[in-house]
């Protein structure tokens, strides 16, 4: 019973973000489709080879995607919304891009599909759309082509396929309502066809991802697994793959399935290995997800070995990453600016492959010397002064209930704010960022590289802020922003100015499509050595008589969009960040900034996957926000922003944030999200996003007016704000000006009645 290792997937963007650059070049019309496809082939070949060189036995194929893997699955099944279809019914890569972006180099523009978070990660997928009587057929053979590529290169491969029930679970019904689970029998023949094609190619194992099995699924969905997998059995061996949580609550459903193996996440789940071994059929393979695919920390391999060693030799066993390595940066070895001590604490995707090789070798030989050597830096870290700050720990321990309460209730504050700002009905604003032009990015890069001194850099940034203020005044917006020219990323910027964080040069991970983020890493206790945003906010406010919002990223979002420490709770990290940013709110207020936005787009995505675990998380998440904001005076208006969210199940907590104004992303869901606020009778002010900033399409005045009228049927007009869905950082100035001009015009039309 020789143990082998495998990964569930590998980062696809490339070490230098080659995929992003190729996509954006193609979208802009600067390269051909053939050139784009060639970059994909080159990256796949490189990544398979890198994994093999790092000691991986069985390589994942089908984990590559041109936008996201759920969208790839939609195309595989022929699930293309009517508005995105080619006239001749064919499907090509531009079809895929139209679903993701709303437009592509060919075909007519049409509203992009809805985008949402992949379980509780920072990765996104395009939500599959289902209509009554829908037909499915094998349409997009990317998976089969990539398997052929890998086999031609001589690799031992394991195709990766998103399972049918998880796929249906992730989608939404459009038009006439029906139970989307009823489509299961319609999509299974396509899965059967794909598995038959893989069998023809001599494939032994297929990784079929069913992460929905870690959720608290309705009984009807659990019941659907047995007949579905009865239909899929027999052509190849199926490794039923779960991740992000444990499977014990649904183990009875799982063990009844006609599959040949089960992958479990032993990092994020609480499954007991001995219990799993006892309950799984004896002829099943167990794939043990021991190496964290979602973080950057070096694994304590001695501990991982102890976790699994008792079942070695008792059943077929593979060792693996907990989930796809998609969520981790690619290679630590190219990081030249991290000091040796801190660098020794980390492992990126390729190093995690090496960890899997070390673990496999030790489990096969019984020799653990290499594991102890690998794990030594982890022991040293526990006592490092880089990690522990007694002053922060003391301040955290001294928090009282009073620290999370504003001085007065919303009604009292709203009156003070109305008297101070005298805003018109339907006040217009934006979410914070303006287009990050090539000039802005070059300016920041030159400064970072030392090619530009601090004075010239500051002059340049001041000029861009001035331009943003001039543009907004010209457009007639009511509440302005400084545009965030100095910020590369809403989380990275704050991390760079807080103690307790470190940064990488090339630690990119994919968020969606071509968007990549470089998350900060929380290595120790968090504190604020000096004001962060005050100087630029104060400068922007000096340029105009209109209020300029101070812009902060909230504590839960900084936590969720960073790689967190693993030695303290997420609650502890969030509250440390909240205390640091509380001081920033006080300093902004003292500098004359009267409106302060604390963005919490990640509040909902941080929810545990199981509803039974929600309350504890929401309690400390809300408390962290309130600690951050509660220092503000009555006439200081606190805004918050949230995106990609479904709120109906957490409305109590949204209201408990007690922000004076909340702006939300609603345009892609056609104001659907406002139902939650209406039913809950949300007491404070709200700005439902009136156009989708993820698409370059410019909305008409009529379209925006119609959305606002729809919103006013649910929320009293006197409590409505008018704003885009999200920040405008990724857009160009021409479409930004056009869209905002239409938005302001729509608000003015409504004021006139």
Swiss-Prot record:
What are its E.C. numbers? 2.1.1.14
Q: Which UniProt keywords apply?
A: Amino-acid biosynthesis, Metal-binding, Methionine biosynthesis, Methyltransferase, Repeat, Transferase, Zinc
Sequence positions that bind L-homocysteine:
431-433, 484, 599
UniProt-listed InterPro entries: Cbl-indep_Met_Synth_N, Cobalamin-indep_Met_synthase, Met_Synth_C/arc, UROD/MetE-like_sf
Q: Tell me which cofactor or cofactors this protein depends on.
A: Zn(2+)
Give the binding site residues for 5-methyltetrahydropteroyltri-L-glutamate. 17-20, 117, 515-516, 561, 605
Reaction catalysis annotation: 5-methyltetrahydropteroyltri-L-glutamate + L-homocysteine = tetrahydropteroyltri-L-glutamate + L-methionine
Q: Does the keyword Amino-acid biosynthesis apply?
A: yes
Catalytic center residues: 694 (proton donor)
Q: Which residues bind L-methionine?
A: 431-433, 484, 599
Quote the cofactor binding remark.
Answer: Binds 1 zinc ion per subunit.
* One Pfam match: Meth_synt_2
Binding-site residues for Zn(2+), renumbered to this chain: 641, 643, 665, 726
Q: Which GO terms describe its molecular function?
A: 5-methyltetrahydropteroyltriglutamate-homocysteine S-methyltransferase activity; zinc ion binding
Entry's Gene Ontology BP terms: methionine biosynthetic process; methylation
Keyword check for Amino-acid biosynthesis, yes or no.
yes
Q: In which pathway does it act?
A: Amino-acid biosynthesis; L-methionine biosynthesis via de novo pathway; L-methionine from L-homocysteine (MetE route): step 1/1
Q: Which family does it belong to?
A: Belongs to the vitamin-B12 independent methionine synthase family.
HAMAP family from the UniProt entry: Meth_synth
What the protein does?
Catalyzes the transfer of a methyl group from 5-methyltetrahydrofolate to homocysteine resulting in methionine formation.
For this entry, the protein name equals 5-methyltetrahydropteroyltriglutamate--homocysteine methyltransferase
Species this chain originates from: Escherichia coli O1:K1 / APEC
Upper lineage ranks?
Bacteria, Pseudomonadati, Pseudomonadota, Gammaproteobacteria, Enterobacterales
């Amino acid at each position: 019973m020789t143990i082998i290792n495998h990964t569930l997937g590998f980062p696809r963007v490339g070490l230098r973000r080659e995929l992003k650059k190729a996509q954006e070049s193609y979208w802009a019309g600067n390269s051909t489709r053939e050139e784009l496809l060639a970059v994909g082939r080159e990256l796949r070949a490189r990544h398979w080879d890198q994994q093999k060189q790092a000691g991986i036995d069985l390589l994942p194929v089908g984990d590559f995607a041109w936008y996201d893997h759920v969208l790839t699955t939609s195309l595989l099944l022929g699930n293309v919304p009517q508005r995105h279809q080619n006239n001749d019914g064919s499907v090509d890569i531009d079809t895929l891009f139209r679903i993701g972006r709303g437009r592509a180099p060919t075909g007519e523009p049409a509203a992009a599909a809805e985008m949402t978070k992949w379980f509780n990660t920072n990765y996104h997928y395009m939500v599959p759309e289902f209509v009554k009587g829908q037909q499915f057929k094998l349409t997009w053979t990317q998976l089969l082509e990539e398997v052929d590529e890998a086999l031609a290169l001589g690799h031992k491969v394991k195709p990766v396929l998103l399972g049918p029930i998880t796929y249906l679970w992730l989608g939404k019904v459009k038009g006439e309502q029906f139970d989307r689970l009823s489509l299961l029998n319609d999509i299974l023949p396509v899965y059967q066809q794909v598995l038959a094609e893989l069998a023809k190619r001599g494939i032994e194992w297929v990784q079929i991802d069913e992460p929905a099995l870690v959720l608290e699924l309705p009984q009807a969905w659990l019941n659907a697994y047995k007949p579905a997998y009865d239909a899929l059995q027999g052509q190849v061996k199926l490794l039923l793959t779960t991740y992000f949580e444990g499977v014990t609550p649904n183990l009875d459903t799982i063990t009844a399935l006609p599959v040949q193996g089960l992958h479990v996440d032993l990092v994020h789940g609480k499954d007991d290995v001995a219990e799993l071994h006892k309950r799984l059929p004896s002829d099943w393979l167990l794939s043990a997800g021991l190496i964290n695919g979602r973080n950057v920390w070096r694994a304590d391999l001695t501990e991982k070995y102890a976790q699994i060693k008792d079942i070695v030799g008792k059943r077929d066993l593979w060792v693996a990453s907990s989930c796809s390595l998609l969520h981790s940066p690619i290679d630590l070895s190219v990081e030249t600016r991290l000091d040796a001590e801190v660098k020794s604490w980390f492992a990126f995707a390729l190093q995690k492959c090496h960890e899997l090789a070390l673990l496999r070798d030790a489990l096969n030989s019984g020799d653990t010397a290499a594991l102890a050597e690998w794990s030594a830096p982890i022991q040293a870290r526990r006592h490092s002064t880089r990690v522990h700050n007694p002053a922060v720990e003391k301040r955290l321990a001294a928090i009282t209930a009073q620290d999370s309460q504003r001085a007065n209730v919303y009604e009292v504050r709203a009156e003070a704010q109305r008297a101070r700002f005298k805003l018109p009905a339907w006040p217009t604003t934006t979410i914070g960022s303006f287009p990050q032009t090539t000039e802005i990015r070059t300016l920041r890069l030159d400064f970072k590289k030392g090619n530009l001194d601090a004075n010239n850099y500051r002059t340049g940034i001041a000029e861009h802020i001035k331009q943003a203020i001039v543009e907004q005044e010209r457009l007639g917006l009511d509440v302005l922003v400084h545009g965030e020219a100095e910020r590369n990323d809403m989380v990275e910027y704050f991390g760079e100015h807080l103690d307790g964080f470190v940064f990488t040069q090339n630690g990119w991970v994919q968020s969606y499509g071509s968007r990549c983020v470089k998350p900060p890493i929380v290595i120790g206790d968090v504190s604020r050595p000096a004001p962060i945003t005050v100087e630029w906010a104060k400068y922007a406010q000096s340029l105009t008589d209109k209020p300029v919002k101070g812009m902060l990223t909230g504590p839960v979002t900084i936590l969720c969009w960073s790689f967190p420490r693993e030695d303290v709770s997420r609650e502890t990290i969030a509250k440390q960040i909240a205390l640091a940013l509380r001081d920033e709110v006080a300093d902004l207020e003292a500098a004359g900034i009267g409106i302060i936005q604390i963005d919490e787009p990640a509040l909902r995505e941080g929810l545990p996957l199981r509803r039974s675990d929600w309350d504890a998380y929401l309690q400390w998440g809300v408390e962290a926000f309130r600690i951050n904001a509660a220092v503000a005076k009555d006439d200081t208006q606190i805004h918050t922003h949230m995106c990609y969210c479904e709120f109906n199940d957490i409305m109590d907590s949204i209201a408990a944030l007690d922000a004076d104004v909340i702006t939300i992303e609603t345009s892609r869901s056609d104001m659907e999200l406002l139902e939650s606020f209406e039913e809950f009778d949300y007491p404070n002010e709200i700005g439902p996003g009136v156009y989708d900033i993820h698409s370059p399409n410019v909305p008409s005045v009529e379209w925006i007016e119609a959305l606002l009228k729809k919103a006013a049927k649910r929320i009293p007009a006197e409590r409505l704000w008018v704003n885009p869905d999200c920040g405008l950082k990724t857009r160009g100035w021409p479409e930004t000006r056009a869209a905002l001009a239409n938005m302001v015009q729509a608000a003015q039309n409504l004021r006139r009645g």
